Curated annotation (Swiss-Prot):
This is Sec-independent protein translocase protein TatC. The Tat system comprises two distinct complexes: a TatABC complex, containing multiple copies of TatA, TatB and TatC subunits, and a separate TatA complex, containing only TatA subunits. Substrates initially bind to the TatABC complex, which probably triggers association of the separate TatA complex to form the active translocon. Keywords: Cell inner membrane, Cell membrane, Membrane, Protein transport, Translocation, Transmembrane, Transmembrane helix, Transport. Pfam families: TatC.
Length: 271
């Protein structure tokens, strides 16, 4: 009976800690939402700037439902507040999982935890400053003397958020692949061998994550393939370092046990 109580106690403690971490995270999102709602109009104008630069200063967006402008500002505030709360969310996640990790596991994961939001920000920045102007020029090129573009707030925000998230996720590809390489789940040789299949998968992923037009699909597929190659490049460094570490450990074992090089190469001699 006492054993059951002792086993349940750590579980209850973990659940209480998880609840506290979640409450802090939700609180951070709410605070971020409230702060961003005060500037929701300015944030939306910032997001709409690439479109206005192409349409001209006199161009305006429309909303076709009475509540559309209000709920658009709510969505803008939520996504901006979520982005603002990211440091708190990552900190709470790390504080929850870190005590259950060994020192070498913490050392391996911590750099990836720091670089993850940075890479996502880089992907979103690429979308905003490079992809948006090119994509909007392409879309607006279908205007004519009888056809005029009248973008609505809701549809524009949906497109912008979708592209920012898509490019942000794309830039996270090295994090996932390098963690898999570090864990020994995949190898750079395997990634190179399957490169042609992954190129096809890149275009499939781009088709899923972007609007159904070939222009934005290609614009997203190119960074996916670039991130793939970057993962292979840095993955080789991880494998090289691991091989050197294993060789050093093997040499140290041989030195401690007075084993010559032939014995190191033939493990059956170690017995």
């Amino acid at each position: 009976m006492n054993l059951d109580v002792e086993q349940k106690a750590p579980l209850v403690e973990h659940l209480i800690e998880l609840r506290n971490r979640l409450m802090i995270s939700v609180g951070a999102i709410i605070v971020g939402f409230i702060l961003c709602y005060s500037f929701s109009e300015q944030i939306f104008e910032f997001l709409a700037a690439p479109l206005h630069e192409i349409l001209g200063p006199q161009a305006k967006m429309i909303y076709t439902a009475l509540h559309e402008a209000f709920f658009t500002q709510i969505k803008v505030s939520f996504f901006a507040g979520l982005f603002l709360a990211m440091p708190v969310l990552f900190t709470q996640m790390w504080l929850f999982i870190a005590p259950g990790l060994y020192q070498h596991e913490r050392s391996a994961i911590l750099p990836f935890l720091f670089v993850t939001p940075v890479l996502f920000f880089m992907g979103g920045t690429l979308a905003y400053y490079f992809v948006f102007p090119l994509a909007f020029k392409f879309f607006l090129g279908f205007q004519s003397s009888t056809i005029e573009a009248l973008p609505s707030m809701r549809e524009y925000l949906s497109l912008v958020i979708k592209l920012i998230i898509a490019f942000g996720i794309t830039f996270e590809l090295p994090v996932g692949l390098l963690l898999a390489i570090k864990a020994g789940v995949v190898s750079t040789a395997g990634l190179v061998d399957k490169r042609k299949y992954n190129i096809v998968l890149a275009f499939v992923a781009a088709a899923i994550l972007t609007p159904p037009d070939p222009f934005t699909q290609v614009m997203l597929a190119i960074p996916i393939m670039l991130m793939y190659e970057i993962s292979i490049f840095f993955g080789r460094g991880i494998e090289r370092k691991r091989a050197e570490q294993e060789a050093a450990e093997e040499a140290q074992w041989a030195a401690d046990h007075n084993v010559d090089d032939d014995d190191v190469d033939h493990p059956e001699h170690k017995a």
